[in-house]
Every structure is written in C-alpha cells, then in structure tokens.
A protein has these predicted regions:
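Lipid interaction determinants
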Residues: 1-140
C-alpha cells in the first residue's frame, strides 16, 4: 500500500472549498462559496463523493464552463461513486464511475491530481486543472 493509499483508506473528508476558474481567470464557485460535501474512501478502494449547494436553489448567476457544471447548478447537488486506483508516483487518483447524478459521468474515468498536507486533501481535475477541491479529514 502506498503513502496516499494509506492516508485515505477508511477515511471521511469534509469539503472546505470547491472552485473553478473561468476563461478570464476569474474564480467561480459552481455550487456557491458555502457548498457542503463529503468524500468517503473505503478500505476496499471505493469512493463516494457528495457535494451540494448550501441553498440548493440552482440559481447562482454564474456562466459555467461545462454541461456537467450546469447540471450541478440546476440540481444544486453532485454525487458519484465507484472503485478507484491510485498512481502513487504520478499522485493521481482515478475513479471508474459506476453511479452518478450527472449521467455523462457513468462509465467514465475521473482522474484527480492529489496533494496532501496534514489533515488536508487537495484534489484537482487532471483534464481541467482549474477545478479544485479542498477537503479536511474528519476526526475519528
């Protein structure tokens, strides 16, 4: 088991920040600045991600970068789950999505660059590095 795998196995993390950057370099928050969420990593290498807008009204007034982000805003919620593998050398976590609120995610592989510092987990989308999520590990 690698270092990242050891750190996340059997843990739950709380969302601190979910942000993206538009084409003009402006920071946007696809589900609002106060989005809430959890990410769970099981001991048998499965992941479950749930993120929601605090107000869930779907009206953020932001022009989104992708159809998936538009769908998230409409619903005020994003969730997906499936088995994952970690490339410890490249520091990439890749999830094979089995279930998702966004139908285009089902059957896809979602790759995230991983960085850890203490009880903080930083994930960024490999294909869209402007999308960043910050998580804090929940205490046992």
């Amino acid at each position: 088991m690698g270092k990242i795998q050891e750190l996340i196995a059997g843990t739950t993390w709380e969302l601190i920040s979910f942000q993206s950057e538009d084409k003009n370099g402006e920071i946007i928050y696809p589900l609002g600045k106060d989005a809430k969420g959890f990410i769970l990593f099981t001991l048998d290498n499965r992941i479950s991600v749930h993120i929601m807008a605090a107000d869930r009204n779907g009206n953020t007034g932001i022009l989104f970068l992708t159809e998936a982000e538009k769908k998230m805003a409409e619903l005020g919620y994003h969730a997906y789950s499936g088995p994952f593998v970690i490339d410890e050398e490249a520091k990439i976590l890749e999830t094979h999505v089995e279930v998702s609120l966004v139908s285009s995610y089902v059957g896809s592989k979602q790759a995230r660059k991983v960085k850890t510092e203490g009880d903080m987990l930083y994930l960024s989308n490999v294909q869209h590095p402007e999308r960043k999520l910050v998580w804090r590990r929940l205490k046992k």
